[in-house]
Amino acid sequence: MGVNVFGIINLEKPRKEKLEFREPFEVFKSIYSEYESSFLLESMESDTGLARYSFIGFEPEMIIRAREGVIEIDDGDSREEFDSKNPFEDLRGFLKMEKNSGGFCGGLVGYISYQAARFFDTIRLSEGDFPDFEFGLFLDGIMFNHLTGECSYISRHGNRLPDISPLLGDEVPTGTLGYRRERTLLSKRRYMDMVLEAKERIREGEIFQAVLSSATDYRLRGDRLAFYESLRRINPSPYMYHLKLGEREITGSSPEMLVRVEDRRIETFPIAGTRPRGRTEEEDGVIASDLLSDEKELAEHLMLVDLARNDIGRVSEFGSVEVPEYMTIKRFSHVQHILSHVTGKLRDGMDAVDALGAVFPAGTVSGAPKIRAMEIIESLEGVPRNAYAGALGYLSLNGNADFAITIRSMVCQGKTGRIQAGAGIVHDSIPEMEYLECQNKARALLKSMEMAGEQVDPDNR
């Protein structure tokens, strides 16, 4: 395609103006209803050590979508389309890699659908209902540094601070969300049958593991920020997000990083092995000890750490891949997980787009070997995953990137919202237990929906 938008847009030196620090969500509520497209990427404290920055963006310069071999550029006034054999190769035309450290300094913010894996590996996946990717090019926004307590307006193109300043002091009440369950894509019986089919493939030696998911669709009306407000209250995570790009919105509380690139250091935190939280700290400890002595969970985690090491090794300098943290317990509101930390250093000639492609999709939402596991998932689940199990985050103009795995999320298109969760299937999996794991992972989302409003007939206004 050969598009270079920075031949059209004048990229200025970074402008930074300090603002009074307020809670990111309170600021976002003031901005959300004023713009058709906006985002909040919010880090909230947990014992993972990942919470660092939060970002708000609004009304991007353009939105870039890829679907069916075509890239569409929508600047709000007009749309252009270009044929593209591999849209991720062409995505670099919307980035200007600058040598400048420090998180996000303007760039692409959006999501990548699970179906986009076919551009990174030789695999056949069906077309989804969502674009393969959808990013806004955001050249200004608000940055919150939770370590220093600083808040700043940052800009690389123009100055829209006067436009939003009148909004920033507003106290905006949250509305309510009306919802109605429309359909569950898989019954409990069908999900357990899928587990048995996957175990048969494992016994035949095709794979070691496959992550099978179940989804439920809801009809929605009202204030979707009410759902996010409830979710951040009961399930704070290092990766909280509310992304609105026109008619598509993704709201989530992901515990798991897909990949981060900062100053050419690449890292990921594979999570595998799950138990519910206890009612007390002592009960938490007992449950965690049981988790760390479960041979099935440990074998699954080791497999996924090895997969992460291999993925990162594809784009890292020889000998630079390390595992500085291995099989530690990390706790969230409703569940606790086994977590490890895998790092590497990007080798010369590689960038954040290469790093993203090397690890996408995460082994923790696909399986091992990854390609064959994904083919089996496609045949068993029967419907495209779309944004679920893909990635959401940013590619910064300075070459940095930070993406969460799109799990523990509600994915909305129009009036429909979908909640989806999965479990890793191995040779000794018990179908009933795997089904319950999916339910445990979705519990915080369902509770958030209940807190945000009430079950109604959304078409009865």
Curated annotation (Swiss-Prot):
<feature type="binding site">
    <location>
        <position position="437"/>
    </location>
    <ligand>
        <name>Mg(2+)</name>
    </ligand>
</feature>
<dbReference type="InterPro" id="IPR019999">
    <property type="entry name" value="Anth_synth_I-like"/>
</dbReference>
<feature type="binding site">
    <location>
        <position position="388"/>
    </location>
    <ligand>
        <name>chorismate</name>
    </ligand>
</feature>
<dbReference type="GO" id="GO:0004049">
    <property type="term" value="F:anthranilate synthase activity"/>
</dbReference>
<comment type="function">
    <text>Part of a heterotetrameric complex that catalyzes the two-step biosynthesis of anthranilate, an intermediate in the biosynthesis of L-tryptophan. In the first step, the glutamine-binding beta subunit (TrpG) of anthranilate synthase (AS) provides the glutamine amidotransferase activity which generates ammonia as a substrate that, along with chorismate, is used in the second step, catalyzed by the large alpha subunit of AS (TrpE) to produce anthranilate. In the absence of TrpG, TrpE can synthesize anthranilate directly from chorismate and high concentrations of ammonia.</text>
</comment>
<protein>
    <recommendedName>
        <fullName>Anthranilate synthase component 1</fullName>
        <ecNumber>4.1.3.27</ecNumber>
    </recommendedName>
</protein>
<feature type="binding site">
    <location>
        <position position="300"/>
    </location>
    <ligand>
        <name>Mg(2+)</name>
    </ligand>
</feature>
<keyword id="KW-0028">Amino-acid biosynthesis</keyword>
<keyword id="KW-0057">Aromatic amino acid biosynthesis</keyword>
<dbReference type="Pfam" id="PF00425">
    <property type="entry name" value="Chorismate_bind"/>
</dbReference>
<dbReference type="GO" id="GO:0000162">
    <property type="term" value="P:L-tryptophan biosynthetic process"/>
</dbReference>
<keyword id="KW-0460">Magnesium</keyword>
<feature type="binding site">
    <location>
        <position position="408"/>
    </location>
    <ligand>
        <name>chorismate</name>
    </ligand>
</feature>
<comment type="pathway">
    <text>Amino-acid biosynthesis; L-tryptophan biosynthesis; L-tryptophan from chorismate: step 1/5.</text>
</comment>
<dbReference type="Pfam" id="PF04715">
    <property type="entry name" value="Anth_synt_I_N"/>
</dbReference>
<feature type="binding site">
    <location>
        <begin position="422"/>
        <end position="424"/>
    </location>
    <ligand>
        <name>chorismate</name>
    </ligand>
</feature>
<comment type="subunit">
    <text>Heterotetramer consisting of two non-identical subunits: a beta subunit (TrpG) and a large alpha subunit (TrpE).</text>
</comment>
<feature type="binding site">
    <location>
        <begin position="238"/>
        <end position="240"/>
    </location>
    <ligand>
        <name>L-tryptophan</name>
    </ligand>
</feature>
<dbReference type="InterPro" id="IPR010116">
    <property type="entry name" value="Anthranilate_synth_I_arc_typ"/>
</dbReference>
<feature type="binding site">
    <location>
        <begin position="273"/>
        <end position="274"/>
    </location>
    <ligand>
        <name>chorismate</name>
    </ligand>
</feature>
<keyword id="KW-0456">Lyase</keyword>
<dbReference type="InterPro" id="IPR005801">
    <property type="entry name" value="ADC_synthase"/>
</dbReference>
<dbReference type="InterPro" id="IPR006805">
    <property type="entry name" value="Anth_synth_I_N"/>
</dbReference>
<dbReference type="GO" id="GO:0046872">
    <property type="term" value="F:metal ion binding"/>
</dbReference>
<keyword id="KW-0479">Metal-binding</keyword>
<dbReference type="InterPro" id="IPR015890">
    <property type="entry name" value="Chorismate_C"/>
</dbReference>
<keyword id="KW-0822">Tryptophan biosynthesis</keyword>
<comment type="similarity">
    <text>Belongs to the anthranilate synthase component I family.</text>
</comment>
<feature type="binding site">
    <location>
        <position position="424"/>
    </location>
    <ligand>
        <name>chorismate</name>
    </ligand>
</feature>
<feature type="binding site">
    <location>
        <position position="43"/>
    </location>
    <ligand>
        <name>L-tryptophan</name>
    </ligand>
</feature>
